[in-house]
Amino acid sequence: MHGPRPTLQEIVLDLYPYNEIQPVDLVCHEQLEDSDNETDEPDHVVNHQQQLLARREEPQRHKIQCMCCKCNTTLHLVVEASQENLRSLLQLFMETLSFVCPWCASGTQ
């Protein structure tokens, strides 16, 4: 359309009747290139996974709340450890490791 209003010369009508159904080719004839070096995952997913793995390996601060084994006072600890070392510490908590508060350790209570 040229101008603000359509004119009759610009309107094209297809006035041929369709009496028979014409088949439509739905097959895509696109050829894909070989992708031996590419992975199925997008780059941002791979980068996110690498960041998570790197974060697990580097030490991070973790807050631990536990009880004194003598007087049951709540103790707050902050440790800096990797995920693997933190799991080892938690395993020790489950088995034999106990904490003593500073008052019980000094024997003033």
Curated annotation (Swiss-Prot):
<feature type="region of interest" description="E7 terminal domain">
    <location>
        <begin position="1"/>
        <end position="47"/>
    </location>
</feature>
<keyword id="KW-1048">Host nucleus</keyword>
<dbReference type="GO" id="GO:0042025">
    <property type="term" value="C:host cell nucleus"/>
</dbReference>
<keyword id="KW-0244">Early protein</keyword>
<feature type="short sequence motif" description="LXCXE motif; interaction with host RB1 and TMEM173/STING">
    <location>
        <begin position="26"/>
        <end position="30"/>
    </location>
</feature>
<dbReference type="GO" id="GO:0039645">
    <property type="term" value="P:symbiont-mediated perturbation of host cell cycle G1/S transition checkpoint"/>
</dbReference>
<keyword id="KW-1035">Host cytoplasm</keyword>
<keyword id="KW-0899">Viral immunoevasion</keyword>
<keyword id="KW-0553">Oncogene</keyword>
<keyword id="KW-0010">Activator</keyword>
<protein>
    <recommendedName>
        <fullName>Protein E7</fullName>
    </recommendedName>
</protein>
<keyword id="KW-1114">Inhibition of host interferon signaling pathway by virus</keyword>
<dbReference type="GO" id="GO:0003677">
    <property type="term" value="F:DNA binding"/>
</dbReference>
<dbReference type="GO" id="GO:0003700">
    <property type="term" value="F:DNA-binding transcription factor activity"/>
</dbReference>
<keyword id="KW-0479">Metal-binding</keyword>
<dbReference type="Pfam" id="PF00527">
    <property type="entry name" value="E7"/>
</dbReference>
<keyword id="KW-0922">Interferon antiviral system evasion</keyword>
<dbReference type="GO" id="GO:0030430">
    <property type="term" value="C:host cell cytoplasm"/>
</dbReference>
<keyword id="KW-1078">G1/S host cell cycle checkpoint dysregulation by virus</keyword>
<feature type="zinc finger region">
    <location>
        <begin position="68"/>
        <end position="104"/>
    </location>
</feature>
<keyword id="KW-1121">Modulation of host cell cycle by virus</keyword>
<keyword id="KW-0805">Transcription regulation</keyword>
<keyword id="KW-0804">Transcription</keyword>
<dbReference type="GO" id="GO:0019904">
    <property type="term" value="F:protein domain specific binding"/>
</dbReference>
<dbReference type="GO" id="GO:0008270">
    <property type="term" value="F:zinc ion binding"/>
</dbReference>
<comment type="subunit">
    <text>Homodimer. Homooligomer. Interacts with host RB1; this interaction induces dissociation of RB1-E2F1 complex thereby disrupting RB1 activity. Interacts with host EP300; this interaction represses EP300 transcriptional activity. Interacts with protein E2; this interaction inhibits E7 oncogenic activity. Interacts with host TMEM173/STING; this interaction impairs the ability of TMEM173/STING to sense cytosolic DNA and promote the production of type I interferon (IFN-alpha and IFN-beta).</text>
</comment>
<feature type="short sequence motif" description="Nuclear export signal">
    <location>
        <begin position="86"/>
        <end position="94"/>
    </location>
</feature>
<comment type="function">
    <text>Plays a role in viral genome replication by driving entry of quiescent cells into the cell cycle. Stimulation of progression from G1 to S phase allows the virus to efficiently use the cellular DNA replicating machinery to achieve viral genome replication. E7 protein has both transforming and trans-activating activities. Induces the disassembly of the E2F1 transcription factor from RB1, with subsequent transcriptional activation of E2F1-regulated S-phase genes. Interferes with host histone deacetylation mediated by HDAC1 and HDAC2, leading to transcription activation.</text>
</comment>
<keyword id="KW-0945">Host-virus interaction</keyword>
<keyword id="KW-0863">Zinc-finger</keyword>
<comment type="similarity">
    <text>Belongs to the papillomaviridae E7 protein family.</text>
</comment>
<dbReference type="GO" id="GO:0052170">
    <property type="term" value="P:symbiont-mediated suppression of host innate immune response"/>
</dbReference>
<keyword id="KW-0862">Zinc</keyword>
<dbReference type="GO" id="GO:0039502">
    <property type="term" value="P:symbiont-mediated suppression of host type I interferon-mediated signaling pathway"/>
</dbReference>
<keyword id="KW-0238">DNA-binding</keyword>
<keyword id="KW-1090">Inhibition of host innate immune response by virus</keyword>
<dbReference type="GO" id="GO:0006351">
    <property type="term" value="P:DNA-templated transcription"/>
</dbReference>
<dbReference type="InterPro" id="IPR000148">
    <property type="entry name" value="Papilloma_E7"/>
</dbReference>
